[in-house]
């Protein structure tokens, strides 16, 4: 494949990446006070790209979160809890109690589709 074919492939991958971006804000369950059964859904503000559910003993926190802060140290510091389980996800209303119990998943379907597309494109480029 020549330079022109590589440019076309890059352009197609760029278009795919743009279309994979949903264009709407993420919806998460969000309860200002810890509860065991949060049913309040909100549209997350700009910059909050992840839903969080965290459990510290009997306290369960559901809220919009920043993926960059989805680690034990940041979560425990911001929630002021020293021991907790947590789960971050990037799909609408994905932060419900069963996610902590089942272990959940961390990759969205869009992410998987994009990764598979990139792998297939790379394999196609490397094929003689």
Curated annotation (Swiss-Prot):
PROSITE patterns: LY6_UPAR. SUPFAM superfamilies: Snake toxin-like. GO terms for cellular component: plasma membrane; side of membrane. It comes from the Eukaryota. A lipid is attached at residue 102 (GPI-anchor amidated asparagine). N- and O-glycosylated. It holds the Pfam family CD59. InterPro entries: CD59, CD59_antigen_CS, LY6_UPA_recep-like, Snake_toxin-like_sf. The keyword RNA-binding does not apply. Disulfide bonds join 28-51, 31-38, 44-64, 70-88, 89-94. Keywords: Cell membrane, Disulfide bond, Glycoprotein, GPI-anchor, Lipoprotein, Membrane, Secreted, Signal. Glycans are attached at residue 43. One of its GO terms (molecular function) is complement binding. Transmembrane segments: none annotated. One of its GO terms (biological process) is negative regulation of activation of membrane attack complex. Residues 103-128 form a propeptide. Residues 26-108 form the UPAR/Ly6 domain. It is found in: Cell membrane; Secreted. Potent inhibitor of the complement membrane attack complex (MAC) action, which protects self-cells from damage during complement activation. Acts by binding to the beta-haipins of C8 (C8A and C8B) components of the assembling MAC, forming an intermolecular beta-sheet that prevents incorporation of the multiple copies of C9 required for complete formation of the osmolytic pore. Interacts with T-cell surface antigen CD2. This is CD59 glycoprotein. It comes from Chlorocebus aethiops (Green monkey).
């Amino acid at each position: 494949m020549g330079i022109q074919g590589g440019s076309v492939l890059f352009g197609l991958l760029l278009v795919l990446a743009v279309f994979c971006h949903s264009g709407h804000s993420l919806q998460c369950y969000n309860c200002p006070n810890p509860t065991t059964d949060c049913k309040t859904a909100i549209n997350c503000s700009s910059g909050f790209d992840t839903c969080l559910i965290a459990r510290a003993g009997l306290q369960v926190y559901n809220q919009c979160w920043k993926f960059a802060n989805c680690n034990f140290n940041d979560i425990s510091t911001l929630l002021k809890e020293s021991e907790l389980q947590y789960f971050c996800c990037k799909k609408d209303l994905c932060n419900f109690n069963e996610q902590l119990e089942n272990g959940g998943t961390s990759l969205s379907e869009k992410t998987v589709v994009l990764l598979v597309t990139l792998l297939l494109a790379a394999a196609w480029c490397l094929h003689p």
